[in-house]
Amino acid sequence: MKDEANLTFSHNLESVSSDDGMRFQREKFCPRVERAKKFLGETIAEARVLDIGIGYGSFLNILEQDYGIQNLCGMDPFPKSLEMSKKNTSADLRQGDIDDQEWPFSKPFDLITCFDVVEHLKIPSVFFTRSARYLKPGGLVLVTTPNKTLPYHMRKLPFIGKPDLNPTHINVRVPEYWRRLALGTGYEILDEWMGEHLTHIKFVPPLLSAALDKMGLDPRNIPGLNHFQQSFCLLLRKL
């Protein structure tokens, strides 16, 4: 893949790494880590973690700074991502692609994370089968992908929809597809949720989110409304 195919960098590193930028990143990533922490327990700081598709390195920075995890690795096919992330984390960063027959690591991991990447793959099952090779027995996978439920299709509505303009989103699938894929490639599902941010259409989600916040309600926990959440998230254990 050529570097120019990476559409990740819609912001500069300075804005992402600013106080406001990192506050947004923590709101996005920390709930995911807390769910994984329930299964890793108090040993999370000693966990060996691989993040695939590292972006700006913000998630690795949070694992390092907020959770004290030092045994961190990252893999990304794009040199620009590796270059930018080195300014954000001291993790062991290596160039590699999910589709590669061999990943550039020899020691197995307790946890492999992969956020908003599998929808870019021609054959998404490759991620799950490759990850299994690099996990310790009983190791965990935390994977997220666009939440293709009914509200996702509202992106196409004129005037109020937020269209998905990323041409590399070639495998945006319904949650049941990902459940079957995980179960069929040797994992058990420990947890699943729809999370992060209300999205897909303009105006209504921000107003509704603000109203729910005032009432102390979390839209991620409200059936039906949680379908407006941006991501479908799976926490898996290798069998």
Language-model segments: which ranges?
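Conserved N-terminal segment of class I S-adenosyl-L-methionine
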Residues: 1-107, 111, 115, 128, ...
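Short catalytic micro-motifs in class I SAM-dependent methyltransferases
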Residues: 115-122
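A short glycine-rich, Lys/Arg-flanked "PGG" loop and its adjoining helix->strand segment in the class I
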Residues: 126-137
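Conserved beta-strand signature within the Rossmann-like core of class I S-adenosyl-L-methionine
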Residues: 139-145
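Short, glycine-/aromatic-enriched active-site segment of Class I SAM-dependent methyltransferases
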Residues: 147-169
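Short alpha-helix
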Residues: 170-185
